[in-house]
Amino acid sequence: MQWEVVIGLETHTQLSTVSKIFSGASTAFGAAPNTQAAPVDLALPGVLPVLNKGAVERAIVFGLAIGAKIAPKSIFARKNYFYPDLPKGYQISQYEIPVVQGGTLTFQVEGKNGQPGYEKTVQLTRAHLEEDAGKSLHEDFAGMTGIDLNRAGTPLLEIVTEPDMRSAAEAVAYAKALHALVMWLGICDGNMQEGSFRCDANVSVRRGPDAPFGTRCEIKNLNSFRFLEEAINYEVRRQIELIEDGGTVVQETRLYDPDRKETRSMRSKEDAQDYRYFPDPDLLPLVIGDDWIERVRATLPELPAAMAARFESAYGLPKYDASILTATKATAAYFEAVVADAGAANAKAAANWIMGEVASNLNRADLDIDAAPVSPAQLAKLLARIADGTISNNTAKKDVFPAMWAGEHGGDADAIIAEKGLKQMSDSGELEKIIDDVLAANAKSVEEFRAGKEKAFNALVGQAMKATRGKANPAQVNDLLKKKLGAA
């Protein structure tokens, strides 16, 4: 029996406003408990919520970026439930009419086990504004639970997809693309450790693509891409095994235990009627006119997809390279700065170096590209020295770039090349003499090459490079050898 996995995601993105969605209290992370909670956040009597305009504009920015409809009129509703860290006994959210309606997000799914990657588009159902709840501190007090209301009232944009994903890999790829987009737009800092970006996964299975949807379970508060993938894969296995053993999947909310790598039941899954939604009488309908939308549209940065398309057309980059270079705004800016100095002719080389040597060194040092020890101008100079034949690409990787990364000579490629004596041989007469000596000393390899053994030619190239201590231009060595062997 071929099972099909069906996944939809709800993502809570904390909006990057300085103050909360309905009060003037700060949203800064890490303050002492209950020091950033205004009377509205504490649900003190006689206080009224005031909507944060910045939160609304960030929602509009997101809606425009995904091609969604911005509702001309949306309603705030009270979502009623009891929890100790929810002082009002309800959460202000949006239910029937969200501010952002529809939209799509297109992204790349990496291939696995030899399978090629592919492009995927997910339909978004909605994105609505709401306030966050406070935080229960279970481990800080012996036999008691503490309540920190600093987070209460923090502005969230809850982004909901259609059940369009068919594997954990697709769900993770979507989450990564969404994470990159909200950071690119500047509407969320994307800090998953601090809870700024967290996902709920709705997972079900069915017997093939034409079967009715199965009973779904919601896995709450997944705050890393690894946890998201592990939780979905476990839940899929659990549901399939349960059904195949004659059991029935129960609609419920589950939590993921990363230590045991399993999900466990938290509570039965609520339906909308359980929350008794009704319009909040303290808040007027949110009215967004076309003029407001156009003012916000004018502030939008170039979007990743548009920039990637420009990189393909302007610089002749492959689609994969363009997508990697536009994964973050900082990476794209670094690439464009390198190309501005090195010239468009070196764009492909710049892309290769940024995705290769620069990325691997950043990963090892756990640095963002903004903090790279090698500046775009310094990398551009290194590329120029490769292009003009001063050094080979191999020498640049093995000897020059590591020294630049370590800050030798202020990261100046020319100074490092001179100090280490790495400049390639420019005297063709001297190189020709060395190659003659190599051919004379390796008569067996010459004979094997002439007998049709291509590997013998590579051996001769290696001997020539060794004789020049790596200072010869490999392309020039190849050309001279072929000429002298009559293979040119």
Swiss-Prot record:
Q: Which Gene3D superfamilies match?
A: 1.10.10.410, GatB domain, N-terminal subdomain
Q: List the catalytic activities from the record.
A: L-glutamyl-tRNA(Gln) + L-glutamine + ATP + H2O = L-glutaminyl-tRNA(Gln) + L-glutamate + ADP + phosphate + H(+); L-aspartyl-tRNA(Asn) + L-glutamine + ATP + H2O = L-asparaginyl-tRNA(Asn) + L-glutamate + ADP + phosphate + 2 H(+)
Q: Keyword annotations for this protein? A: ATP-binding, Ligase, Nucleotide-binding, Protein biosynthesis
> What is the protein name for this chain?
Aspartyl/glutamyl-tRNA(Asn/Gln) amidotransferase subunit B
State one Pfam family annotation. GatB_Yqey
Q: Which InterPro entries match?
A: Asn/Gln-tRNA_amidoTrfase_suB/E (IPR017959), Asn/Gln-tRNA_Trfase_suB/E_cat (IPR006075), Asn/Gln_amidotransferase (IPR018027), Asn/Gln_tRNA_amidoTrase-B-like (IPR003789), GatB (IPR004413), GatB_C_1 (IPR042114), GatB_Yqey_C_2 (IPR023168), Gln-tRNA_amidoTrfase_suB_CS (IPR017958)
Gene name of the encoded protein: gatB
The family note in this entry says: Belongs to the GatB/GatE family. GatB subfamily.
